[in-house]
Every structure is written in structure tokens, then in C-alpha cells.
């Protein structure tokens, strides 16, 4: 069967122009205009999706099949082009019957054209084929437009669903244009409103805990660029204004330390005549420590000196992915659980904004893994937030899982974050030594987010940074009172 793409080539129908018109109409639709005004960051992300839409429409037109009636009419037209005028006159009755049987839009006009001329000439033969071709072009264009209209409705429905999802999550997860683009890419999954409302719920909880949010931001910025002075700095000329006593004596305004011999105090001048104090006088003269009269009159002059150019190189510290281990033991339930999940959501926001990866591992009796920054990040985040913390605490297994992942090439510069109350058994010696080796040799950083003031110091001593967020009732009341 004839494909629509082949028909367009045969009749020289420009499908690119039709596709561009459809995309322009889609972007100009009122729904998108209102959305772009409300969420300007997502406008660029949706616009970046246009090439994908264009390619999908091309593929759809290429694979579409032409109706059998139109296919048969096109075949008849191609055969008629090969006929000479006498042959065409012989075949004309069959051609007209075929057009009538196929209900072709050209059938009635073709019969009227033939009936209006008693003799079929070569010019009439050419005119007949030209008008027939125009009719086929109109039919092919109409078929393209119908197909593109169906695709436009389907695409608009898909975009509206993704806009609803992205619009709900943009205030929570999109901190800049990069994050907005990644959020839009994630919204392509099949999600229902009730699913992503869980993210909205924990986003609202995070806004109610600004201290927890700031803690996540500080952890995310813990690898700032460091400035390093250059050792090979060149000398440069530096001009400065120096204030000096006026050469013309004026009113005495007080005393000062200087090397002005002409205005020495008599006691200072007397030391010059004492042999034992002569060297002391010269030392103080060189160091400008002699007591002299300070005149009221002052003047400024320009002094030219040379000094090293103070330029600095910046050692950009790598900001790698996050590997976050969350304690799901029973002691981490309730408010601790809410804080841990909200903290991971804040790290996900940072990862999206800085184009980093965010990998979550839940540890208790077994380890469950989620990647919140992947193409299915929203679905993974919903699954993670749906988990309940009711297991035991196996901190050693958590560290072993972290170390195993850190040894792979794609995670070599990752930061490990452990969220727990750290009320657990001490770590085995082999785990402790391996962590120290990773810190010393590979410069991996281990962060602890302590949800309790009663964590064991012996466990927490292994971490590079300890971020404390006490979830006890007293600390919660104090934070609320300060706000």
C-alpha cells in the first residue's frame, strides 16, 4: 500500500511547511500562552522539545498509509501520464468510470471538461492531466492536514498533562532554567495527579522547615572553588597618595612618631649626645619612631612603588553526585521520617539545578535504591516518599553499599551523605579503615546528617562533616519560636 510520504514525494507536496504551521499553531494556543506567562522558566524547556515534536511528526507522516481509493486513483493517474493522446482517447471512458466509482473529487469536473469539448486534442489531454494532478495535490494536502490535526490534538493533550505536572512541581524542584529543563524531561512519564501530590506535600513541609532547607543548601555548596595565589606573580607599578607634614611651619597640633629631624623634641635630641643611647636613636630614626612635633599644615604627594601583581588561580572543586543513605529504622519514624524525606527532596532540587545526580539508598534489613535525577526521577521520588520507616538499623551494610558504588567510574567524585539518628552499633574495623582510605586516597567526602542529639560519637567521628538537625521536641519548639 502507498505511504503518505511516497505520495508527498510523487506530487511534490511540502510536508515540512505543514509541520511548521502546525507547531506554530500549537505554541500559539491560549493554553500554552497562559502557562508560559505563569512559569517562564519552563518556556525554554518546552521550546527545546520542538525538534523532538518535529521529528515525531515526520515519522508519523512517513509511516501513515494512503486510503485504498486514493492509492488506486494515483496509480491510474501515473498510468495515464504514459499514454499518448490517441491512447488516452481510447482509455478515457474507463478512466471516467474509475473516477466515478472511487468517488473522486475530480470525477464530476473531469466529465464536465470532456462533455464541453467534442474533440479531444493534445492540449485538452494536457489540461486534463494538469487539473487531475491539482485535485490529487489537494487530496494529499487534506490528508496531511487531517493527520497533523489528529497529532496536534494528541500532542496538545500530552503537553497539557505535562504542564500541569511541571507547574505543580516547578516551585518545589526547579531552582533555575537547568532544573526546569530536567523537570520537564522527567514529566514525560505516565503519572496521575494523586501520585505527584506526595511531592507537593513534602515540598510544603520543607518550606515549613527553613533550617532544614538551609542545611541542604550548605551541604550542596560544601565544595566551593578555592583561590590559590600565584607564585610567579610579576611586579607592577602602583601609585598611591602619601600624606606628609607641610614644609612650611604652621601651628603645632600635637606629637607624633616620625623621622623628621627638624621637628624633634628636645628629649629625643638629647639622647643623640649620650654615647650609650646613640645607636638606639639611630634605630628609632630608621624605624620612624622618634617623637616629633605634629604640624597642623599637611600636604599630599604621589608616591610610586612596585609590588607583585596579586592575581589568583581558582581551584574549582568538583561537585559530583550525591549518594544519600537514609536510615529507615523504627527510631527514624514520625517527624524524623518527614525531615529525612524532605531533606532528600531538597538535595534532589540542588542536583537538578546543578546538573548532578542524586542517588538514594534506604538501609535497614535490606537496601532499596532510587535515582531521583534520572529520566524516571519523579516516579522514583514518589516511590521513595511512599516508603515507611519501620525496619532495623544496619549501618555497616549501608557503608559497604556506598563504598561499592564509589569504586565505580561514574561515581568516583560523589559525596556520600548518611541521614540517621546514629543510635546504632559501632562500625566494624574493616569498614572504618576502608572509609578512611577513601577519604585519604580518593578525597571522597562523607557527610552525616544527624537527626538526634544522642548519636554515638564513636560512629560519627568517621565523617568529614556533621550537619546537625535535632528533631527533639525542645529543639523543634526553639526553632518555631525563633521564626
Curated annotation (Swiss-Prot):
The entry's keywords: Chaperone, Cytoplasm
Stored HAMAP family: ViaA
Taxonomy, superkingdom: Bacteria
Family according to the record: Belongs to the ViaA family.
NCBIfam families tied to this protein: PRK10997.1 (NF008230)
Function: Component of the RavA-ViaA chaperone complex, which may act on the membrane to optimize the function of some of the respiratory chains. ViaA stimulates the ATPase activity of RavA.
Species of the source: Escherichia coli O17:K52:H18 (strain UMN026 / ExPEC)
Name the record gives this protein: Regulatory protein ViaA
Name of a matching Pfam family: VWA_CoxE
Record's subunit section: Homodimer. Interacts with RavA.
CDD domains, A to Z: VWA_YIEM_type (cd01462)
Cell compartment(s), UniProt: Cytoplasm
Predominant place of localization: cytoplasm
Family matches, as Gene3D superfamilies: von Willebrand factor, type A domain
